[in-house]
Amino acid sequence: MSWAKQRVPFLDDDDGEEENDVQDDVDSPVPTRPLVIDEDAEPAAGTSGGLEGGGGDDEDGEDGHALPDLDDDLLLQFEPMLPRVYDLLLPSLDARLNFVNAGQKYAAFLKYVHGDCATCSHGEILREKTQLLTAIVSKLMDINGILEGKDESAPGK
């Protein structure tokens, strides 16, 4: 598999117009090979398969410079955590991540409430937040009680 230099659009400092030129940054430690989604890729030993990040033949680029070579293929697989129906309800990745995050918070809270918190790493945080919320609510109730008590005593005087 051969890889050409990645074309990166950048602004020319002279006239401010966007140009599509090859960016000459051969000394960069970060490889410029794009990640390719290959759903049918066979996973390498010890990996899960899925995304493939370039390791290919060592060929010269357009200007004769050798492209950086990755000795091993990077294979990753991301499995969906939500059923397919949520693709319609939560169209963006941010919405899906927020949904999963909120679900994890509720699951941690349910573990805390039902006493299955021995293995929960968030138990202490939940206890502190619950105590803080209880203190705030009790102060608000005391303020309301004081105000109600003053309102009742004011007409009697």
Curated annotation (Swiss-Prot):
Acidic residues: bias regions: 11-27
Region (Disordered): 1-69
Statement: the UniProt record of this protein carries the keyword S-adenosyl-L-methionine: no
Subcellular location(s) per record: Host nucleus
Record Pfam families: Herpes_UL33
One cellular component term from this protein's GO annotations in UniProt: host cell nucleus
Keyword terms: Host nucleus, Viral genome packaging, Viral release from host cell
GO biological process, one term: viral DNA genome packaging
Top-level taxon of origin: Viruses
Family recorded in the similarity comment: Belongs to the herpesviridae TRM2 protein family.
Quaternary structure note: Associates with TRM1 and TRM3 to form the tripartite terminase complex.
Its job: Component of the molecular motor that translocates viral genomic DNA in empty capsid during DNA packaging. Forms a tripartite terminase complex together with TRM1 and TRM3 in the host cytoplasm. Once the complex reaches the host nucleus, it interacts with the capsid portal vertex. This portal forms a ring in which genomic DNA is translocated into the capsid.
Protein name according to UniProt: Tripartite terminase subunit 2
Organism of derivation: Human cytomegalovirus (strain AD169) (HHV-5)
